Curated annotation (Swiss-Prot):
The modification Phosphothreonine is found at T110. This is Protein eva-1 homolog A. GO terms for cellular component: endoplasmic reticulum membrane; lysosomal membrane; plasma membrane. The chain crosses the membrane at residues 40-60.
Length: 156
């Protein structure tokens, strides 16, 4: 289907880009001023969706960070079944039990690591723990023991 050609050869006047932007801004302003509740709802919904997507991306990055960094070599060394057949290609298909075992091993490795590099840091940490324990005991012993049947209001 052919469209008829326009008889005039004059170029069609186009709006300048600045005027179109100004017109769009004014239209948005009038919509917001006429419907403030709806505009607020759209804004809050957009912020919530953005936060949800950011949270999902962070969770995925944190949970997959160590699994994605591992190469097939490390996987083979941990499983003690390193073969050059299609096993290295199928290594990405982990079961839930393998993942839980790997996480448990990783947790045990972090427990066995020495966090403190010097004896001074270790001594400081022990003193800090002792101080926190003493403060906690003082706090717990300083609280009045209120029986369960009595009212919590002291001034009556």
């Amino acid at each position: 289907m052919k469209l008829p050609l326009s008889p005039s050869t004059e170029p069609v006047a186009t709006e300048p880009l600045g005027m179109a932007l100004l017109s769009s801004i004014l239209a948005a302003w009038s919509y917001i001023s006429e419907n403030p509740e709806r505009a607020a709802l759209y804004f809050v919904s957009g912020v919530c969706i953005g936060l949800f997507l950011t949270l999902a991306a962070l969770v995925m990055r944190i949970s997959c960070h160590t699994d994605c960094r591992r190469g097939p070599r490390r996987r083979c060394l941990q499983d003690r079944e390193c073969s050059d057949s299609s096993d290295s290609e199928d290594g990405s298909e982990d079961t839930a039990s393998d993942l839980s075992v790997r996480r448990h091993r990783r947790f045990e490795r972090t427990l066995n690591k020495n966090v403190f590099t010097s004896a001074e840091e270790l001594e400081r940490a022990q003193r800090l723990e002792e101080r926190e324990r003493i403060i906690r005991e003082i706090w717990m012993n300083g609280q009045p023991e209120v029986p369960g049947t009595r009212s919590l209001n002291r001034y009556y």
